[in-house]
Amino acid sequence: MKTLLLTLVVVTIVCLDLGYTMTCCNQQSSQPKTTTNCAESSCYKKTWSDHRGTRIERGCGCPQVKRGIKLECCHTNECNN
């Protein structure tokens, strides 16, 4: 009986994938695509303009931004590319 219970617990953990992390893009502006694994459940893409032109920042989570910065948050892997 204990063996059956232990087997069910292991199968449940494997099926639920309790260690799931989200994959978000983290390259800046027009740099080559890079990704990172995140503990957060969302990715973001911030866009703004300055004296160098349009700037883009990508990363994990969904931060608050200042006025004049466009923020897009999403909830699937690499959705912020």
From Swiss-Prot:
SUPFAM superfamilies, per the entry:
Snake toxin-like (SSF57302)
User: What PROSITE patterns does its record include?
Assistant: SNAKE_TOXIN
Q: Does the record's keyword annotation contain Cytoplasm?
A: no
**In this UniProt entry, which cysteines form S-S bonds?**
C24-C43, C38-C60, C62-C73, C74-C79
Q: What is its main location?
A: secreted
Provide a Gene Ontology MF annotation, just one: acetylcholine receptor inhibitor activity
Origin species: Hydrophis hardwickii (Hardwick's spine-bellied seasnake)
> InterPro entries of this UniProt entry?
Snake_3FTx, Snake_toxin-like_sf, Snake_toxin_con_site, Toxin_cobra-type
Tell me its family. Belongs to the three-finger toxin family. Short-chain subfamily. Type I alpha-neurotoxin sub-subfamily.
User: Which key words are in the record?
Assistant: Acetylcholine receptor inhibiting toxin, Disulfide bond, Ion channel impairing toxin, Neurotoxin, Postsynaptic neurotoxin, Secreted, Signal, Toxin
Q: Where in the cell is it found?
A: Secreted
Pfam families cross-referenced by the UniProt entry: Toxin_cobra-type
Where, by tissue, is this protein expressed?
Answer: Expressed by the venom gland.
Chain segments annotated as transmembrane: none
Keyword Ligase appears in the UniProt entry: no
Name it: Short neurotoxin SN160
Q: Where in the sequence is the signal peptide annotated?
A: 1-21
Of the GO CC terms on this record, one is: extracellular region
Function (record text): Binds to muscle nicotinic acetylcholine receptor (nAChR) and inhibit acetylcholine from binding to the receptor, thereby impairing neuromuscular transmission.
